Amino acid sequence: MARFFRRRKFCRFSADGVVQIDYKDIAMLKNYVTESGKIVPSRITGTSAKYQRQLSTAIKRARFLALLPYTDSHK
């Protein structure tokens, strides 16, 4: 029987040496928001606690400035 091994999750921000997460980088922020508009938890993305806090504030700022939607399009 073949076993399936999950890839180890790692923080991409720590690996890339990011100091501060920018709220204007919409393409990067969209990777951490679901289709319905929710912020993806760190246990799924593997983001460290420090960068998860920065990520959530960056997403909330982008939403406030209408760069990101709060919810999906409700079709």
From Swiss-Prot:
The keyword Endoplasmic reticulum does not apply. Signal peptide: none annotated. Keywords: Ribonucleoprotein, Ribosomal protein, RNA-binding, rRNA-binding. GO terms for molecular function: small ribosomal subunit rRNA binding; structural constituent of ribosome. One of its GO terms (biological process) is translation. One of its GO terms (cellular component) is cytosolic small ribosomal subunit. It holds the Pfam family Ribosomal_S18. It comes from the Bacteria. The keyword rRNA-binding applies. Part of the 30S ribosomal subunit. Forms a tight heterodimer with protein bS6. NCBIfam families: S18. Belongs to the bacterial ribosomal protein bS18 family. Binds as a heterodimer with protein bS6 to the central domain of the 16S rRNA, where it helps stabilize the platform of the 30S subunit. This is Small ribosomal subunit protein bS18. It comes from Pseudoalteromonas atlantica (strain T6c / ATCC BAA-1087). The gene is rpsR.
